[in-house]
């Protein structure tokens, strides 16, 4: 524990003391605005209420001026908690200012983590590989490692935790007392903290707000959990929040945590002891984590007990054991990053001949397999109004007012994204069915717009219409393998798994598969 405490103190030695004055700087809000927050309040709600995007800078200056007034933030929070009956313009200003303060403060408190990334990169050279930023880079790791493992624990990271715990976590990195007081005020005065954690679509205030603010504190909590879980000697990655909840890992997206040293963790006079496990692997994305091991089932049960007590005594969070499921890999498939993954066991008979004697040896081969979860994906398409619950394609009614090129372009992007994301599936037939459903949904949308039947529409547009739904993947793959000397027939590409190393976020249509 003394070694761990010393590491914690050394790692957090660069604490920041002067962050609160940045809240009054205009460039902080400009930084938050240009951080790639798709669909943030800086764009859409301004247009909804009759303002244009250029007025955002004026509102920022107006906010900074009013923040110098005494108790203005108290009035701001109180107004944001009221309904729209207080007046249309007054409600808009309250909501807009409240959102700017939350996103601006989130940009400020990210500074200590940004500086830590700079210092740690200067102290120790890190391998510069942009491929590690891709989500798909994790699957070659799974293919290489998971076929040799026996058990896997699927962990749903518990949330939300108490707001005071979030403040205490941030206090380890920030020693600016005004900033901490401001954070406590911001959280305690906010009546609907649970809506921060689980945004309610029926509420304007939470449907598009607070994403950056929430993701930063959620990942601060997850980072603290992982930091203390494996007792890392150095910070292995940097979390930078984005609007959709994925976080680009600037160093290693995954890693093999070797030699998990026997540790004694004292939680309320209780001691938990663990043994070394050189084949333990930990992978996390969003709210789900996977802990896999080649060891016995009892060791996995010890880890489960440890995690439950860890959340309870360190984070003061009542974690239920059912949130951690232990399964044997050879008998279980698990959802991860939109894929249904499993380890296939293929029996193999090998004939060995020595002199006049021959032997028949029975053995097995293990292979990590990834397939498309068709039923959940159809459910996601159904929620997006592309098909019915049973998978029958339907027209996208809200797109009927767009031009033909826009309609085809939108459906084409959806099919290309699905094709790229699920290119690593071992069974492409399911992917082709999904793409066919999207193609037919596009045709139905165009037919609804022009008030024609699908057959009449396709006859008028020609047979070459909608070819981009199917031809782009073959063109890309044929270009990749055209320079190889080994013959690689195109029909074999449909059975090969191709991992694209430029995918930095999970597809929206599969995002719900990985959230608890």
Curated annotation (Swiss-Prot):
Compartments, as annotated in UniProt: Plastid, Chloroplast
Plastid among keywords: yes
Keywords from the UniProt entry: Chloroplast, mRNA processing, Plastid, RNA-binding, tRNA processing
GO molecular function per UniProt: RNA binding
Keyword Chloroplast: yes
Family label: Belongs to the intron maturase 2 family. MatK subfamily.
Name of the featured protein: Maturase K
Gene for this chain: matK
């Amino acid at each position: 524990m003394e070694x761990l405490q010393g590491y914690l103190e050394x790692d957090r030695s660069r604490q920041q003391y002067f962050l609160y004055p940045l809240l009054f700087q205009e460039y902080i809000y400009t930084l938050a605005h240009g951080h790639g927050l798709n669909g943030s309040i800086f764009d859409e709600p301004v247009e909804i209420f009759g303002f244009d995007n250029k007025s955002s800078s004026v509102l920022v200056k107006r906010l900074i001026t009013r923040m110098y007034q005494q108790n203005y933030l108290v009035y701001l929070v109180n107004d944001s908690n009221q309904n729209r009956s207080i007046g249309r313009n007054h409600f808009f200003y309250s909501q807009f200012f409240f959102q700017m303060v939350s996103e601006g403060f989130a940009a400020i408190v990210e500074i200590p983590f940004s500086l830590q990334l700079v210092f740690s990169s200067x102290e120790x050279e890190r391998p510069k590989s942009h491929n590690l930023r891709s989500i798909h880079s994790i699957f070659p790791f799974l293919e290489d490692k998971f076929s040799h493992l026996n058990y896997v624990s699927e962990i749903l990271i518990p949330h939300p935790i108490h707001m005071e715990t979030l403040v205490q976590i941030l206090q380890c990195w920030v020693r600016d007392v005004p900033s901490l007081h401001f954070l406590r005020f911001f959280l305690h005065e906010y009546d609907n903290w649970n809506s921060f954690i689980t945004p309610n679509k029926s509420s304007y205030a939470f449907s598009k707000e607070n994403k950056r603010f929430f993701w930063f504190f959620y990942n601060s909590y997850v980072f603290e959990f992982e930091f203390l879980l494996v007792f890392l000697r150095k910070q292995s990655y940097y979390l930078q929040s984005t609007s959709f909840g994925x976080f680009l890992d600037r160093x290693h997206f995954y890693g093999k945590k070797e030699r998990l040293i026997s540790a004694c963790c004292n939680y309320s006079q209780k001691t938990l002891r663990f043994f070394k496990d050189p084949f333990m692997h930990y992978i996390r994305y969003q709210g789900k984590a996977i802990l896999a091991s080649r060891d016995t089932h009892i060791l996995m049960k010890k880890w489960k007990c440890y995690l439950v007590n860890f959340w309870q005594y360190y984070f003061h969070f009542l974690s239920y054991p059912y949130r951690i499921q232990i399964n044997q890999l050879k008998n279980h498939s698990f959802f991860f990053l939109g894929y249904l993954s499993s380890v296939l066991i293929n029996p193999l008979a090998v004939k060995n001949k020595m002199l006049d004697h021959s032997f028949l040896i029975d053995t097995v081969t293990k292979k990590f397999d990834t397939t498309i979860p068709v039923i959940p994906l159809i459910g996601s398409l159904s929620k997006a109004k592309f098909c019915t619950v049973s998978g029958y394609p339907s027209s996208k009614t809200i797109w009927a007012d767009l031009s033909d090129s826009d309609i085809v372009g939108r459906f084409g992007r959806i099919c290309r994204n699905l094709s790229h994301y699920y290119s690593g599936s071992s069974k492409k037939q399911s992917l082709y069915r999904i793409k066919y459903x999207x193609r037919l949904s596009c045709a139905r949308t165009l037919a609804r717009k022009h008030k024609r039947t699908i057959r009449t529409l396709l006859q008028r547009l020609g047979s070459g219409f909608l070819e981009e739904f199917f031809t782009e993947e073959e063109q890309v793959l044929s270009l990749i393998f055209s320079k190889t000397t080994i013959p690689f027939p195109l029909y074999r590409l449909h059975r090969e798994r191709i991992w694209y190393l430029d995918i930095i976020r999970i597809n929206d249509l599969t995002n719900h598969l990985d959230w608890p």
